[in-house]
Amino acid sequence: MPLLKSTFLPSLPFRNGHFNTIYRPLFMKEGHNYKRKRINTWDNDFLDLDFSTIGSNTLVIALHGLEGSSKSNYIVSLVNHLNSLQIDCVAVNFRGCSGEDNNHLHSYNSGKTDDVSLIINHILITKKNKYFSLLFDVNFIFS
C-alpha cells in the first residue's frame, strides 16, 4: 500500500504532543451526570450502563478501552459533545470498571464479545432508537 503525503497541519499549539496531552484535561467540563442502569449477566454477575439522554431517537453506545470507564476523559468528552448534537448516549462500563467489584473474579478483554451482545440485546429490547456504536482501544474485535 503506498504512503500518502498529508497536507494537514494542526494549528500552532497543537503541533506539540505535550500540549495535546494536557489540553483536554485542563479545558474539559468536569464529569458528567449519568443515570446508571445495572443489567444482570448470564453468569450471575452484572454490567453497569451509564445513560445520558436528552430525548433523542438516536443512541450512541460508547465502549471504553482497557482500564477505562464511563468516567474516562475521552468518554465524558464524547458524551458531552454528542448530547450537544441532540444525540442520546449510553457509556458502557465493562466488568470491573464501574467503580464497584463484580461478583466474579474474571474481567473483560477485547475477545470477550458476549457482554457486548448482552448490552446490545438489552438496549434493543428496552429502547426504541436508531443505533450507532463507537469503539475505543478494543483491537477492533467488534467491528
Segments predicted by a language model, with ranges:
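Basic nucleic-acid-binding interfaces
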Residues: 92-93, 143
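Short beta-strand element of the alpha/beta-hydrolase
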Residues: 57-65
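N-terminal cap/lid segment of alpha/beta-hydrolase-fold proteins
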Residues: 16-54
